[in-house]
């Protein structure tokens, strides 16, 4: 495997190449390139890119997943979007798009946090109610839910011991579920929003069967992941008798890592697409606003300095 890490020096080289080409009569600015601009050259400049579903078209109502802001020094800041569309970018400068991205990112955090809180709170109440009911029956020795209408006196000693054992195990399980849910809810309640920070990115090339040509190119970077503990019940009214047999009917998901590595695979460039007064160019799943006469973008070649290959 042949690997080259994208370093600050490599980014500087890409920027220098861009300036050199511009001085030779071609403009290689991200927005106004007069010659096709390679991925490393484009990302090596200050620029704002839009990530969207690679299977979708660039259109006014198309949803935006993320906005990526490159600082020209080998770093990118990723902002998640909450229902933003390509139409929302119309008439905005890059700085205004970044401000919108910051607002959107916080909205994503707030929405996911609130959804987790709203789902987990009734789950805690329901589990607590079942636990309290079964605990009272266990402590008092009535075992009403477990008897399901039968008389306690009808049980053999062996049956009674088995019923006690079931209660004990179920109560232990419920207590563990309650503690996990309460701890998760407390962590979610105390979570505060932190604005995304610039992170280094790497580029990776996959070659074709000859090993000489680029088949695809991938950009990888760390990005915030807003994931919170969440408990969900199939039915908020859990029957204690059923819980003794089947357990709590529902599920829970643990909070994920605050930072997650993301990758976007780039294939052949897409044709320029116009939305209102904007012209977009880039790749399936990743585009930026350019001038109408922009020459487009291209994948890097396997011999490009600073890029991992295969």
Where are these regions (language model features)?
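Mature, Sec-exported extracytoplasmic domains of Gram-positive
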Residues: 28-310
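Bacterial N-terminal signal peptides that target proteins for export
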Residues: 2-11
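C-terminal motif of bacterial Sec signal peptides marking the signal peptidase cleavage site
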Residues: 18-23
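Short amphipathic alpha-helical "recognition" segments used for binding
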Residues: 6-7, 24, 116-118
């Amino acid at each position: 495997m042949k690997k080259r890490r994208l370093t600050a020096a490599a980014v500087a080289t890409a920027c220098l190449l861009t300036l050199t080409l511009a001085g030779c009569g071609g403009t290689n600015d991200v927005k106004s390139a007069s010659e096709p601009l390679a991925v490393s050259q484009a990302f090596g400049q200050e620029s704002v890119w839009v990530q969207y579903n690679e299977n979708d078209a660039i259109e006014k109502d198309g949803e935006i997943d993320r906005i990526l802001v490159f600082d020209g020094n080998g770093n990118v800041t990723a902002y998640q979007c909450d229902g933003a569309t390509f139409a929302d970018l119309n008439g905005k400068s890059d700085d205004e798009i970044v401000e919108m991205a910051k607002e959107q990112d916080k909205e994503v955090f707030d929405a996911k946090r609130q959804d987790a809180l709203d789902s987990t709170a009734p789950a805690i109440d329901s589990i607590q109610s079942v636990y309290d009911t079964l605990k009272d029956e266990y402590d008092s020795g009535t075992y009403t839910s477990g008897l399901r209408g039968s008389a306690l006196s009808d049980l053999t000693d062996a049956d009674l011991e088995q019923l006690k054992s079931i209660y004990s195990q179920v109560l232990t399980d419920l207590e563990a579920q309650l503690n996990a849910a309460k701890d998760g809810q407390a962590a979610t309640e105390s979570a505060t929003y932190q604005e995304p920070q610039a992170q280094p990115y790497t580029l990776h090339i996959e070659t074709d069967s000859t090993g000489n040509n680029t088949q695809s190119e991938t950009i990888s970077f760390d990005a915030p992941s807003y994931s919170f503990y969440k408990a969900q019940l199939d039915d908020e009214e859990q029957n204690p008798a059923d819980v003794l047999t089947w357990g709590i009917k529902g599920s829970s998901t643990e909070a994920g890592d605050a930072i997650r590595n993301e990758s976007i695979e780039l294939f052949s460039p897409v044709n320029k697409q116009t939305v209102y007064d904007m012209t977009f160019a880039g790749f399936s799943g990743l585009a930026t606003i350019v001038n109408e006469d922009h020459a487009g973008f291209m994948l890097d070649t396997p011999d490009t300095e600073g890029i991992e290959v295969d």
